[in-house]
């Protein structure tokens, strides 16, 4: 058994954004404007990126490049034509309630503070909804047209954006024991903790109009990887604990859907925390395994009878 305090957790939600009457919207500019509309007394535009290294892998090495580095280079090239500094483009805000609100590529992203109870987490997630909606209303007035936000995970054209969960775990827990214990759970969790959509998609394309119970599963093709934007993995290995790296790791879960229902959020995060606690209590325990976790994803997400 690995001694540990209660598991801390949090949620990062990227919102889809659109404006009525504008087909070819500059979503980056719109996202920047929306986030900056949250500027008011007590809100500061600052963030320390020094400890962030998206190339650092939980398995013990640094990858030379990410699959999304090409996209990042394109974003950087586009951003050089904006009359804004890097800090102004990111518009990283630390809110008074401990949340982080910023422009992540082409999406406004709201990150809850670290929470120790499900009630606290749900309250912060709902507070995030109110913050982004208040910003949308302000921006709509400024634009003279309705700015719409979508708490979902796809544009139905083969592009997905995330609702990520974070769980603070002791570094003493071996990575291979963590992944062996949680792998089958993350696949089967899709059955009861996702939001669903009426579409089947692939990278950069819409495939067919059929219902499935998960929004994100169409976009996962790897078992483990440090990437988050292309060839997404079932288990993300990015090692950015935002804490003392000698003691802690941040288990970054990227396969979940954004939930509107507080009950669904409780179920998603609560069951995950229980599984993680079970792993911490007995890391050597033999947890259930799937012969082919990636093959199981399309089976469970497209079942409407829960019998796959």
Located regions from the model:
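Short coil/turn motifs at secondary-structure junctions
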Residues: 20, 170-172
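Short, solvent-exposed loop/turn segments at secondary-structure junctions
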Residues: 115-117, 154-156, 172, 218-219, ...
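A short alpha->loop->secondary-structure connector
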Residues: 174-176
């Amino acid at each position: 058994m690995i001694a540990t305090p209660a598991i801390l957790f949090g949620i990062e939600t990227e919102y889809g954004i659109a404006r009525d009457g504008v087909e070819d919207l500059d979503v980056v500019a719109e996202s920047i404007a929306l986030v900056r509309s949250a500027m008011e007394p007590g809100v500061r535009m600052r963030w320390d990126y020094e400890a962030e290294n998206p190339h650092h892998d939980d398995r013990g090495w640094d990858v030379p490049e990410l699959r999304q580095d090409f996209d990042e280079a394109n974003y950087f090239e586009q951003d050089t034509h904006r009359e804004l500094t890097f800090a102004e483009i990111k518009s990283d805000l630390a809110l008074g309630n401990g949340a982080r609100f910023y422009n992540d590529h082409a999406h406004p992203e709201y990150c809850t503070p670290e929470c120790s109870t499900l009630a606290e987490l749900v309250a912060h997630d709902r507070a995030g909804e109110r913050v982004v909606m208040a910003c949308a209303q302000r921006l709509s007035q400024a634009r003279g047209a309705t700015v719409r936000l979508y708490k979902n995970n796809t544009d139905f054209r083969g592009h997905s954006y995330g609702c990520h969960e974070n769980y603070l775990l002791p570094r003493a827990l071996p990575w291979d024991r963590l992944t062996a214990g949680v792998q089958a759970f993350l696949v089967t969790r899709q059955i009861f903790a996702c939001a669903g959509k009426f579409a089947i998609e692939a990278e950069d394309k819409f495939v067919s109009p059929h219902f499935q119970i998960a929004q994100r599963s169409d976009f996962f093709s790897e078992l483990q990887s440090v990437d988050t934007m292309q060839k997404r993995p079932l288990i993300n290995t990015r090692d950015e604990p935002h804490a003392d790296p000698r003691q802690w790791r941040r288990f970054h879960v990227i396969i979940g859907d954004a939930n509107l229902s507080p009950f669904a959020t409780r179920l998603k995060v609560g069951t995950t925390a229980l599984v993680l606690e079970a792993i911490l209590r007995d890391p050597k325990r033999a947890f259930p395994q799937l012969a082919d976790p990636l093959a199981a994803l399309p089976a469970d997400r497209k079942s409407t009878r829960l019998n796959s």
